[in-house]
Structure formats: structure tokens, C-alpha cells
Amino acid sequence: PTDGCPGWTVRDVVAHCSSALMRIVESRYEKGVFSPEANDRDIAERAEWTNAQVVDELERGMTEAGPVIAKAGGALDLAALGEWVHGGDVRDALGEPGAYIGPGLPHALTLLARITREKGCLPLHADLDDVDEPLTLGAVSGERTPARYIGDAATLVRLYSGRPVAGRTFELAGAEAKELNIFW
């Protein structure tokens, strides 16, 4: 099981990712695509597949989705960020180091800042222990004083993706963790 996606196994996360990436590659965006119900259907469709088939689909999706996402002008960036977060879910479930960090972190933080601004999320000023510059997230409208986060980048990613933060050391003032989740 994975902590980041309750009720899902690591295989389920990989099956979801492979399906989501192939939807992007094939431009299959029916109503409700990427909803929890659609995700569960996609996982169920792959239940009888071998692990090798799921991994093959994931590899194809990872290879072919990048150019499609890049050409979409930002419209698929939330899906790209979600796939990166799911990589962290898998590493976390397997006890591997580097869950929600690694070489992709600077890109993920850039996407997170832009996506939260475009979605009109609550404003937040993040002082990250492991990043030199502070990060401004959300939309600064003047209606709400920006919340403040002090902690590491991995925990910030966990907060914005609705992942568990129990046992993590951080400070969050002016907002509740549940207000930050951009995926549900």
C-alpha cells in the first residue's frame, strides 16, 4: 500500500500513471478524465495485465507524453506535476530515499508556484530549508494575508499534493494543510 494514495498499491499507482500518460499521448480527454472515478476505472482495466505490460505502457507514456505536454502551453502541467508526485509516492512506499525531491524538484516547484497562482489558490510564502530563495505560491489578491510555511521542499510538495505529513518538521501559519491540496 501507499501512504500518498490510500487504498492503492504501488502497482495501482504505476497503472494509474501509465494510463494517464497514455491518455495524454492519445489525446483522450473525455468528461471526468483524471477524476478519482476515472482513475479507479483505469486501474481496474489493468488489473489482469502482467506487471511487464503495465511497465511497458508506463515507459511508452513517459517517452511519448513529454513532447505532448510541452506543446500544450501549460494546459497539461498539472498532470505532469501529478506524475512527478506519484514518482515520490512510489519511492516513499518502497522506502527509497528522495521521495518528493531529486533532480526534478526545481521544475516541480516552478510548476507548483505557477499552477497555484493560476488556480487562484490561497497565497503562501514558503521559506524552504533546502532551497536558497523563498517561494511565493498562490494568488496574491489582497483579500487574504499570505500564509507562511517554513520547512523542507519535500514536505511542501506533500502538503500541496495531499500527502501525509505526520512526523515531518515544519511550520504552517495562516492556513490549514487541507487548504493547500491542489489535486482534489
Region locations from a protein language model:
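Helix-loop segments that flank and shape redox-cofactor active sites
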Residues: P1-T9, P67-G74
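Short, hydrophobic secondary-structure boundary micro-motifs
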Residues: P1-D3, P36, G167-T169
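Short, helix-capping/interhelical loops that line the mouth of catalytic, cofactor-
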Residues: S19-V68, E96
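Short, structural beta-strand-to-alpha-helix junction motif
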Residues: T9-V10, T50, D152
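Structured surface interface patches that mediate subunit assembly and partner/cofactor docking
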Residues: Y29-V33, A70-W184
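Active-site-proximal cofactor/substrate-binding loop regions of enzyme domains
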Residues: C5-V25
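Generic structural signal for individual residues within well-ordered alpha-helical segments
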Residues: R11-V14, V55, V157
